[in-house]
Amino acid sequence: MWGCGLAWAQRLKTITVGSSGADFPSIQAAVNAAPETGAVIRIQPGIYREVVHVDKPRIQLRGETKDPSKVVLVYGNSAASTCGTSCSATLFVTGDEFFAGMMTVANDYSKHSDVPSQAVAVKVTGDRAVFRHVRLLGAQDTLYAASEKCMDGRSPCAVKRQYFADCYIEGHVDFIFGDAKAVFDRCEIHSIPHLAGGYLTAQSRSRPEQGSGYVFNGCTLTADPGVENVYLGRPWRDYSTVIYLNTKMGSHIMPAGWSEWKSAPVPRLPTATYAEFHSSGPGANPRTREKWSKQLTAAEARKYETKVFLAGMDGWNPTKVK
């Protein structure tokens, strides 16, 4: 089921991608051929080395597999080789009501270069985006879950809603970052080695009224062997908001949980919203957490449930989008 209750109810055109009897050999060619009303793009197993821009609404990228590692979209740009972090992604999504399922999106810059640089796998600035059973692979700045025009502190601005369910997201420093309003349900957030430890998130809510934030619900925080000194997040902007609900945390998570953005002109932790509810595992240490963070009550946690947090004015419920 796709987009239950949406005003557009017409059947979407289907386009195929692959090397065996498909409509197009590349994903970008299929996106280019899609009508403005949207399309279901079915992708055969294979490795697609390209940069993809999805600038149309209602585009679905669906891997034709039950194993997301068999359909791989990958490229190796970096902040240093392009106009900066925002230009380095393998997949750019600006169109609303995007869907991706059963595929991998990767940025493999770090595998081919010893020069550290931000290198984004996915940059999403569309509203009502859904990712299901998707693997996102990178190192620094893997997933840019953003709202585009809110970062400069202007308000009001249009905060974009994004939903990630049963996904695997890998990286080391700030590898889930930006100012979207996003929920991560039942995802594995995996830390890979970095000399200085790492940070799972760098959420960038600039003003309290903007309403963006990240919620991790029922997730698992894992790491490669030997990885340690990893923080749950640090505040990229003054009102950074990150909530962990019912999340299992490995021993690589620092007891303090949260870190200051050390180059900020003034401390940001006092104005950030960092909280947990029913964390478990060796990385769950409520008594040693940074003093500005909070342990939520059950009543407080309810407002971060997916159907509540992402509802918006249109009552969006992404759990029904399959």
Predicted regions, residues:
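Sec/Tat signal peptide C-region and signal peptidase I cleavage site
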Residues: 5-9
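Sequence-level preference for short, compositionally simple segments enriched
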Residues: 10-322
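Sec-dependent N-terminal signal peptides
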Residues: 1-3
